[in-house]
A protein has these predicted regions:
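Terminal-appendage/accessory-domain detector
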Residues: 1-207
C-alpha cells in the first residue's frame, strides 16, 4: 500500500484484508452462523504471527487483535463497530466458543495484508473470498457513501440525526464555504445524552 488509509472498521490495520474478505462473503450470502461447519482464514506469515494466536482472547485489547474473534463477530453480527468490542459482546459465550473453532493459518503465497477466507456449511455449501487490497487502502478507497455511513455510526451518540446530516452537508459544500469555522462549530456542538437531549456540562465532564 502507498499513501494514507482510511479504515472502515475498528480493529488492527493488518487484518483489514481479512475483514474485507469476510464482509465480501457475508454481504453476498445469507449464512446462518449455526450452520457453519468450518471457517478458515489464511494470512501472510507476519500477519499470522501478530494475529493468528488469539483464539482464546483475554479482553478487549486481545479481541481487537484476534483474527479469530474479529471473523466471528463479522459472521454473527454482519457488522463491525465499537459495539463488537464491548465486554457484553466479546464475552458472549457463544462467540467465544465459535472463535475457538475458527482455523487461522499462515499461507506462504500471501504477502502483506492479503487474506483468504473460506466458509463451509453443514449442508455442504462453500463460500470463498480473497482480498489483496483491503477496503480503505489507497488502492481500494472508501466511497463517499461508505465514509458517510461510518460518520453516522460513530456520531450517533454525540449528535442528533438532523445535526449529523447537517454536518455531512457542510462537508459536501466545504469548498463553497466562506470559512471552515462554520463546520468546526458544528462539530463542537453539545453532545447528546442517552435520552437524545443535550447532555449537561457536568455530565459530560464525568463521562
Amino acid at each position: 500500500m502507498s499513501g494514507p488509509a482510511a479504515w472502515p472498521w475498528p480493529a488492527a490495520s493488518s487484518i483489514q484484508g481479512m475483514m474485507t474478505a469476510m464482509f465480501d462473503i457475508v454481504e453476498k450470502q445469507k449464512i446462518d452462523p449455526a450452520q457453519v461447519k468450518t471457517l478458515r482464514i489464511a494470512l501472510s506469515q507476519p500477519v499470522f504471527d501478530l494475529h493468528g494466536n488469539f483464539s482464546r482472547y483475554k479482553a478487549k485489547f486481545e479481541a481487537l487483535l484476534s483474527a479469530h474473534y474479529v471473523a466471528t463477530a463479522i459472521l454473527h453480527d454482519r457488522e463491525l463497530t465499537l459495539a463488537q468490542f464491548e465486554p457484553a459482546r466479546y464475552d458472549d459465550p457463544k462467540l467465544r466458543r465459535f472463535a475457538e473453532r475458527v482455523e487461522v493459518r499462515a499461507e506462504p503465497s500471501l504477502r502483506g495484508v492479503a487474506a483468504l477466507v473460506d466458509v463451509e456449511t453443514i449442508g455442504g455449501d462453500e463460500f470463498s473470498a480473497r482480498c489483496d487490497q483491503p477496503l480503505g487502502a489507497p488502492e481500494n478507497k472508501l466511497s463517499r457513501a461508505q465514509i458517510e455511513a461510518k460518520f453516522r455510526t460513530y456520531a450517533a451518540g454525540r449528535l442528533s440525526q438532523q445535526h449529523i446530516e447537517d454536518v455531512i452537508g457542510a462537508v459536501v459544500r466545504l469548498e463553497h464555504q466562506a470559512s471552515v469555522r462554520t463546520l468546526m462549530d458544528m462539530l463542537r456542538a453539545t453532545p447528546q445524552s442517552a435520552a437524545g437531549a443535550p447532555a449537561p456540562i457536568a455530565a459530560r465532564a464525568r463521562g
